[in-house]
């Protein structure tokens, strides 16, 4: 883990000035200092001082699910993990399973419309199948977390980022100790907060 951090720091320090364009605007960024931390840790960084118990922070990303264990406001690196289950893999699996069950090739954007509760032209029965398949995957993820030693019945759980939408809408049961922070910019805001703290600036 420490070796990976050092490699990332060295990589991002190769060039300290980055020039790029985004949506028609030109930008020039000067890198003053490189900070490395788990992605979903940044999403809750501004709240750590108020977390006076055990928490599991779960960030379902595009390719991996990052999990940070927090005890009394401090991340416990030895109990923080990355799981190779996430949205890209799940969507492809759902497309494959829909092909098997219906004989139809369902485009990725139509699958996402159903999962995000947007208007879709898919038959209702197809939409129900897709939602059921996502419920199975969220359940499978939580089973794996339980198998890795996290007690999902009592520990405080916070799902963060875009994947929190999937967990909230497909978890299948209400739990008073589970929260969903569906802010798509949660990690970016957290990185800004952390950088500000380390540079001695007030952010927020």
Located regions from the model:
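Nucleotide/phosphate-binding catalytic cleft detector across ATP-hydrolyzing
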Residues: 1-55, 77-88, 110-204
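Secondary-structure boundary elements
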Residues: 18, 25-28, 50-51, 60-61, ...
């Amino acid at each position: 883990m420490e070796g990976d951090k050092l490699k990332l720091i060295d990589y991002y320090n190769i060039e300290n000035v980055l020039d790029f364009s985004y949506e028609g605007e030109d930008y020039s960024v000067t890198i003053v200092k490189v900070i490395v931390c788990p992605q979903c840790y940044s999403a809750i960084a501004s709240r750590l001082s108020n977390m006076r118990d055990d928490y599991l922070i779960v960030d379902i990303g595009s390719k991996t699910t990052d999990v940070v264990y927090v005890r009394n406001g401090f991340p416990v690196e030895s109990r923080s993990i990355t799981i190779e289950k996430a949205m890209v893999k799940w969507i492809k699996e759902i497309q494959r399973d829909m092909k098997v069950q219906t004989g139809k090739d369902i485009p990725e954007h139509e699958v996402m419309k159903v999962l995000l509760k947007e208007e879709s032209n898919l038959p209702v029965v197809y939409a129900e199948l897709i939602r059921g398949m996502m419920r199975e995957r969220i359940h499978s993820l939580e089973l794996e977390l339980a198998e890795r030693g996290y007690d999902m019945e009592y520990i405080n759980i916070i799902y963060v980022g875009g994947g929190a939408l999937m967990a909230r809408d497909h978890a299948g049961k209400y739990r008073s100790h589970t929260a969903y922070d569906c802010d798509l910019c949660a990690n970016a805001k957290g990185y800004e907060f952390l950088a500000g703290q380390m540079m001695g600036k007030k952010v927020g």
